[in-house]
Swiss-Prot record:
Record's subunit section: Homotrimer.
Sequence positions that bind UDP-N-acetyl-alpha-D-glucosamine: 8-11, 22, 73, 78-79, 100-102, 137, 152, 167, 225, 331, 349, 364, 375
Name of protein: Bifunctional protein GlmU
Region feature (Pyrophosphorylase): 1-227
Region (N-acetyltransferase): 249-453
Annotated compartments: Cytoplasm
Residues involved in Mg(2+) binding: 102, 225
Catalysed conversion reaction: alpha-D-glucosamine 1-phosphate + acetyl-CoA = N-acetyl-alpha-D-glucosamine 1-phosphate + CoA + H(+); N-acetyl-alpha-D-glucosamine 1-phosphate + UTP + H(+) = UDP-N-acetyl-alpha-D-glucosamine + diphosphate
Enzymatic class: transferase
Naturally occurring in which organism (per UniProt): Nitrosococcus oceani (strain ATCC 19707 / BCRC 17464 / JCM 30415 / NCIMB 11848 / C-107)
Length: 453
């Protein structure tokens, strides 16, 4: 039977104490809802429907995904009410898999196991046993162990509250049965809400097959209700990813001080030091070494690249055996060629620096193309902005630029040219020539420093 996924994401999240909708709070650099959608897509469903409410259009606007149907729940009247809002949109003859937008770590294998149990029809629910079940709806079973109903904690008796098997909120139900049961749902309970869990009791009463599948690990069905729970899941996720990477041959100096906030593809013998943050899509070739306190976002590093401490690399590509840092910032649209050295307190923006060139100290290179075997002295600035527009600097192969040089773009430095220290270059420099632009040095014999009176 084809699957339609419904994700309930309309909750207010009052315990987050935030103006941001709860499902947009981030886990590992992505909204909670993004994790759930990504898992749902692995099922290749006939459709994905997201029910949103609190926060209004900020939720769908954060995704703009063509494969998602967005349904707004104007009034938050419970999970049952939220599910019923999808009735005009769901495809007939499908199995509905109802997920929670604030349960980000549920495993695809668990969902497939649940769906397999109801493939021929009926109602399925995912349960879990908790040492401390406070706050969860309890699973009530009959004398032969079958599920008879789910009772929310607010409506449970003291005896029922001692039950440790709880409802996770993840439910599988045929579309035709949800439509059939919809008129029977009631808000006659302590919360005055329409509970999705009431479906179970109605299903049992009408003779529908009801099955329960137990999650192997409580962490995968843990929801986020406050910032402490979010932080707990964040640490769990990061430790899990760290263990996976070490299993693939990555050396982590301290797995507890590593943050992956996206996708990481790695070669062999990669070393990552403490407090490194990787965001977006990062590719690290064989033998890459990342020093402590570095931030990489959407970066590609070739074989043998070394990044020293305290570097920021964003939207950039670095070829084999290059070295960057410490305290270097590589900004978007930058490419560093093989064997390039970028040193301390250097900023590179929207530039290409070719093989074996060096910018070792205290420089800004922006909107520039630099050839091979170029040496850029300390304090060199490409002056690329005239107050209105950005301009390009071209430095050809084998150029030597002395310290404290300003290159006023647009400008071209010919191959093999040498520029003396302290120059301000406003015109193109011919190939192979020495260019100076300083005022002559003068000394005043007999001059004395003023003394204090």
């Amino acid at each position: 039977m084809a699957v339609s996924v419904i994700i309930l994401a309309a909750g207010q999240g009052t315990r987050m104490h935030s103006t941001l909708p709860k499902v947009l709070h981030q886990l590992a650099g992505r909204p909670l809802l993004s994790h759930v959608i990504a898992t749902a897509r692995q099922l290749n469903p006939a459709q994905i429907i997201v029910v949103y409410g609190h926060g209004g259009e900020t939720v769908p606007e954060a995704f703009r995904a063509a494969d998602i149907t967005w349904v707004r729940q104007e009034l938050q009247l419970g999970t049952g009410h939220a599910a019923l809002q999808t009735l005009p949109y769901i495809k007939p003859d499908t199995m509905l898999l109802i997920l929670s937008g604030d349960v980000p770590l549920v495993k695809i294998e668990t969902l497939k196991r649940l769906l397999a149990m109801v493939d021929q029809g009926g109602v399925g629910l995912l349960t879990v046993e908790l040492a401390n079940p406070n706050g969860y709806g309890r699973i009530i079973r009959d004398r032969v162990g079958g599920v008879s109903k789910i009772i929310e904690e607010a409506d449970a008796s003291p005896e029922q509250r001692r039950i440790r098997e709880v409802n996770t909120g993840i439910t599988a139900i045929e579309a035709r049965y949800l439509k059939q049961i919809a008129p029977k749902l009631s808000n006659n309970n302590a919360q005055g809400e329409y509970y999705l869990t009431d479906i179970i009791e109605h299903a049992v009463a009408s003779g529908e097959k009801v099955v329960a599948v137990s999650a192997a690990d409580s962490i995968e069905v843990m929801g986020v209700n406050d910032r402490q729970q979010l932080a707990y899941l964040e640490r769990f996720y990061q430790k899990r990813e760290a263990a996976r990477l070490m299993g693939e041959g990555v050396s982590l100096s301290d797995p507890d001080r590593f943050d992956l906030r996206g996708e990481l593809l790695v070669g062999k013998d990669v070393y990552i030091d403490i407090n490194v943050i990787l965001e977006g899509r990062v590719i690290l070739g064989d033998g890459v070494k990342i020093g402590p306190h570095c931030y990489l976002r959407n970066a590609v590093l070739g074989e043998g690249v070394e990044v020293l401490a305290n570097c920021v690399i964003e939207e950039a590509a670095i070829d084999a055996c290059a070295r960057v840092g410490p305290f270097t910032r590589i900004r978007p649209e930058t490419r560093l060629g093989e064997g390039v050295h970028i040193g301390n307190f250097v900023e590179i923006k929207k530039s290409t620096i070719n093989k074996n060139s060096k910018v070792n100290h205290l420089s800004y290179i922006g909107d520039a193309t630099i050839g091979k075997k170029v040496n850029i002295g300390a304090g060199t600035i490409t002056c690329n902005y005239d107050g209105a527009n950005k301009h390009h600097t071209l430095i050809e192969d084998n150029v030597f630029i002395g310290s404290d040089t300003q290159l006023i773009a647009p400008v071209k430095i010919g191959a093999g040219a040498t520029i003396g220290a302290g120059a301000t270059i406003t015109h193109d420099v011919p190939p192979g020539e020495l260019t100076l632009s300083r005022t002559p040095q003068k000394s005043w014999p007999g001059w004395k420093r003023p003394s204090k009176k």
